[in-house]
Amino acid sequence: MGMRLFDRPLAPNPYEGLSPSATFTVVSQDLSNGLPMPKLHTAEGGNISPHLEWSGFPDQTESFFVSCFDPDAPTPSGFWHWMVIDIPVSCTSLARGAGSSDLELDGSAFHLRGDHGDHSYFGAAPPAGDRPHRYIFSVHALDIPTLGCDDDTSLAMYSFEALEHTIARATLTATYQTPSN
């Protein structure tokens, strides 16, 4: 008999194990750090990406990338819900719904394919009855304007390549739990 979902160990926050970097601030009109996300931003509630706005990043920042990662997904490697890369330094926010299409993004920014298979935001969708999952929304400040990746680059590979260029990071963590039926 296998382990029940709720009984598995809590996954670590993946950013706590990375080399230290400076921090800055990310806020949202839609999410509050440590609190449940509104249903609008879940897979069953509309799949609408939340508003994010950031400030206080280092002067040497040349671009950003934004991601949403669920370390609590019942997989060996968590679940990437969203990644937008090549965000110009002049862009310091993403509007609610910007995750629906590259057409909603500024300048050269574009989506990488998430673990759900599409180039867009995919809302919270933990298994019914599992404990609350953490959704870590991260804004990464990079010291280069682009890594030269295309939209077929995997999120894990992009994150790996971006590590040596990340000079600061801001995170906001929301939670969500799908009730048991």
Each language-model region and where it sits:
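N-terminus-centered regions that define maturation/targeting leaders and the start
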Residues: 1-181
